[in-house]
């Protein structure tokens, strides 16, 4: 798919299709009014007949509109003009792309980016249109023998901006949107892979492929032997029941000669059976998504490589598989972590934190500016926040605020939960320094409280994506989140000016 921006009048576009908005009740947008005027009232007469009300998602495809050079005009219902918000805008774009793909129009000029969206500017509208378009066209069908493809798919999309002085910001929005979309696609592809393909070695191979493609990226992979030498006994315990070797890939992006790195750590449980504390059979297939954190870090590193930002970033993919077996770790085991702290295992299905605690200890050697871990960590986060919002906890208020700001800018929402000292009491163990679970109350918070014991030397934030990393049901599959949030955070950290409020 090719994207571009231009500034021009709708009636002068020589295109397979021009896309304009119609508001409820049967009110033409300013651009649609221009087409109506040049067509001598042709469009408004259709609306008066009741062909289109303008409700959100309604579509009306017109052919050979009088006075218009374009072959087709697609009227898109946008709802009530004053109520057009971010969510509705993205839904409208998504429905528009689906419709265009079915019309046989291989290219189109879209004027929906001129609509007024509350609190959002041209940059945001163009970038979100790019990201939404790419997400809407995504499919994971490489294991299907019969692939359904449109007869004449949409190949080129031009977004119109109101003035020529906005062309530069529109081009920047496309570049940023394509980078985020690339990262999201990588994340979705890797996460959707079946666990008999995507094991820790596969994750590591994807990290190496990225390094092979860019001169300023290097990748190192640590296997179980080196982990043992480093004392990563907590990480290794989780891997003991599986025949697939645990591997931790460290991807280093160098965009600045001497800046301290931002470190992203992704939980990479390529399959989580629960171990000895085994999960129910129903829905266990979705535990291939327990590496969603690592997939999102890999995707973010791809987006970063596309953007070539002037910062240093290290992405860690903590790959592992949690399986039952004769050598698997057990409830009651006491583990000595890389930090030297001891952990009593009360539940082997609380394994993500046991992998992450050693990974978080390991990254201290990089003298990081900031560390952010990303993990499908707790079912409790789904109970608290559902499937729309990522859980955020942090030991540093400015970092938490940065991430919340990035989440709002990117449309990839997060919500901060508290991390008060009182929650630490739930992790007390009579036999070790701590237990690996803290009981049913505040499960997301106690999981983060556990991790916070290994992050005292640097500014740290934790993103719990258990509810947002994938969808179940008829839309089953990875969402690619929180790649947009993380990429926006890196854009902001690099000093790129990308959005101005209207």
UniProtKB/Swiss-Prot annotation:
GO molecular function: manganese ion binding; metalloaminopeptidase activity
Positions that bind Mn(2+) 2: 267, 272, 290, 351
Keyword Metal-binding belongs to the record: yes
Gene3D superfamilies (alphabetical): Leucine Aminopeptidase, subunit E, domain 1, Zn peptidases
E.C. code: 3.4.11.1, 3.4.11.10
Record keywords, A-Z: Aminopeptidase, Cytoplasm, Hydrolase, Manganese, Metal-binding, Protease
Localization per record: Cytoplasm
Role according to the record: Presumably involved in the processing and regular turnover of intracellular proteins. Catalyzes the removal of unsubstituted N-terminal amino acids from various peptides.
Protein's UniProt name: Probable cytosol aminopeptidase
Originating species: Aeromonas hydrophila subsp. hydrophila (strain ATCC 7966 / DSM 30187 / BCRC 13018 / CCUG 14551 / JCM 1027 / KCTC 2358 / NCIMB 9240 / NCTC 8049)
Gene encoding the protein: pepA
């Amino acid at each position: 798919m090719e994207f571009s921006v231009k500034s021009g009048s709708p009636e002068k576009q020589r295109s397979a299709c021009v896309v304009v908005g119609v508001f409820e009740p049967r009110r033409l947008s300013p651009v649609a009014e221009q087409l109506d005027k040049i067509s001598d009232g042709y469009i408004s007469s259709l609306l008066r007949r009741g062909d289109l009300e303008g409700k959100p998602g309604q579509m009306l495809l017109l052919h050979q509109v009088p006075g218009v050079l374009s072959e087709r005009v697609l009227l898109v219902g946008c709802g009530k003009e004053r109520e057009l918000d971010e969510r509705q805008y993205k839904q409208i774009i998504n429905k528009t792309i689906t419709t265009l793909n079915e019309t046989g129009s291989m290219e189109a000029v879209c004027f929906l980016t001129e609509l007024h969206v509350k609190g959002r500017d041209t940059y945001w509208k163009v970038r979100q249109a790019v990201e939404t378009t790419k997400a809407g066209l995504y499919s994971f069908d490489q294991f299907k023998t019969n692939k359904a493809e449109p007869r004449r798919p949409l190949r080129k999309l031009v977004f119109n901006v109101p003035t020529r002085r906005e062309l530069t910001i529109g081009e920047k929005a496309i570049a940023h949107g394509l980078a985020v979309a690339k990262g999201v696609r990588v994340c979705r592809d890797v996460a959707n892979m079946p666990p008999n393909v995507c094991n820790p070695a596969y994750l590591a191979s994807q990290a190496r492929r990225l390094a092979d493609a860019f001169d300023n990226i290097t990748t190192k992979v640590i296997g179980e032997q080196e982990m043992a030498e480093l004392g990563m006994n907590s990480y290794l315990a989780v891997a003991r029941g599986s025949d697939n070797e645990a591997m931790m890939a460290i991807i280093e992006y160098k965009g600045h000669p001497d800046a301290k790195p931002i470190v992203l750590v992704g939980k990479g449980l390529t399959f989580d059976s629960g171990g000895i504390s085994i999960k129910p059979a129903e829905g266990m297939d979705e535990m291939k998504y327990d590496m969603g954190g690592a997939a999102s870090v890999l995707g973010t590193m791809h987006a970063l490589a596309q953007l070539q930002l002037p910062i240093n970033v290290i992405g860690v993919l903590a790959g592992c598989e949690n399986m039952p077996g004769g050598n698997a770790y057990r409830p009651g085991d006491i583990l000595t972590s890389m930090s030297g702290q001891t952990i009593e295992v009360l539940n082997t299905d609380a394994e993500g934190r046991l992998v992450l605690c050693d990974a978080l200890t390991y990254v201290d050697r990089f003298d990081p500016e900031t560390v952010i871990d990303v993990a499908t960590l707790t079912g409790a986060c789904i109970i608290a926040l559902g499937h729309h919002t990522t859980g955020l906890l942090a030991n540093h208020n400015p970092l938490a605020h940065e991430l919340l700001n990035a989440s709002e800018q990117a449309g990839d929402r997060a919500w901060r939960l508290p991390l008060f000292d009182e929650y630490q009491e739930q992790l007390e163990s009579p036999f070790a320094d701590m237990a690996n679970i803290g009981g049913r109350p505040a499960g997301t918070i106690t999981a983060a409280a556990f991790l916070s014991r290994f992050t005292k030397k640097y500014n740290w934030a934790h993103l719990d994506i258990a509810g947002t990393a994938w969808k179940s049901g008829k839309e089953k599959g990875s969402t690619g989140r929180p790649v947009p949030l993380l990429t926006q955070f890196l854009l902001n950290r690099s000093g790129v000016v990308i959005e101005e409020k209207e």
